[in-house]
Design a protein with these regions (language model features):
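Glycine-rich phosphate/pyrophosphate-binding loop and the adjoining helix
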Residues: 180-219
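Short histidine/acidic/glycine/proline-rich micro-motifs that form metal-
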Residues: 51-54, 126-129, 162-166, 197-200
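N-terminal beta1-alpha1-beta2 submodule of the flavodoxin-like/Rossmannoid cofactor-binding fold
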Residues: 7, 11-123, 129-145, 204-219
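Residues within the helices of the helix-turn-helix
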Residues: 4
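Short, solvent-exposed coil/turn elements at secondary-structure transition points
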Residues: 81-83, 161, 194-197
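Short, glycine-/small-residue-rich phosphate/pyrophosphate-handling segment
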Residues: 150-188
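Hydrophobic/aromatic beta-strand patches that form the interior of the parallel beta-sheet core
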Residues: 45-47, 76-78, 156-159, 189-192
């Protein structure tokens, strides 16, 4: 599938995906979904997208990390919201698998570790009912390592938002499950959607902390 076909597939999934099982797999059932087929120790790359170092989504990433490490997994983390990752300029210099003219920023860390990771976790706050610009910039830069990321991997995602309307979150769930994962050939390993989280620290003591922890244990 070329770049244009991928974009069309992802947009179609985001815009028109039916409200199916993905909605029901948020929260506690995410850990159950992740428990199937996830045996063995793994290298897990976490990519977060919040510009707030101690925001709610990053706190859930911490809990996921705790669960994963307690199970014996190696965890490597890239906080895109606190790094310098420039957006893809569509120059095609890389030819979908090669040197990127922007690789003097922080993206080479992702390039290095995603090649050897058996699992990837995406963590993002929801801004205007989509993922953050910071994490989207990382995903778009996958174009330069398109062959590398087309490999057998498990992947999960964590989303946080102030609203509690799950129907509005479904297009993001579809983007990951029906768009990105289908294109890359990655195995879906579960997700957590933390709703009703507005101020920093709102997630502390919530059920989402345990759900993120168990997702990490079962990645």
């Amino acid at each position: 599938m070329n770049r244009r076909d991928f974009i069309k597939t992802a947009l179609a999934a985001a815009a028109g995906g039916a409200l199916t099982g993905g909605l029901r797999f948020s929260g506690a059932r995410a850990a159950e979904a992740a428990s199937t087929g996830g045996g063995g120790k793994k290298k897990v790359l976490i990519i977060t997208g919040s510009p707030r170092a101690h925001g709610n989504s990053n706190t859930l990433a911490d809990e996921f990390t705790r669960g994963a490490r307690e199970t014996g997994h190696e965890v490597v983390r890239f906080d895109a919201g606190l790094k310098n990752v420039r957006p893809c300029t569509a120059c095609n210099h890389c030819g979908m698998q090669g040197p990127c003219i922007l690789d003097d920023d922080d993206f080479p860390f992702v390039r290095e570790h995603i090649a050897t990771a058996q699992a990837v976790l995406f963590v993002s706050p929801v801004y205007y009912y989509t993922i953050s610009a910071q994490i989207k910039a990382v995903i778009d830069r996958f174009y330069a390592i398109n062959g590398t990321v087309h490999a057998r991997k498990r992947s999960a995602f964590i989303l946080t938002l102030a609203n509690s309307d799950m129907e509005r979150v479904q297009p993001i769930i579809d983007y990951f499950r029906k768009g990105l994962y289908d294109y890359l050939g990655w195995e879906y390993a579960g997700h957590v959607v933390g709703t009703g989280l507005w101020p920093v620290g709102a997630v502390n003591g919530s059920r989402f902390m345990d759900e993120a922890y168990r997702l990490g244990r079962n990645i």
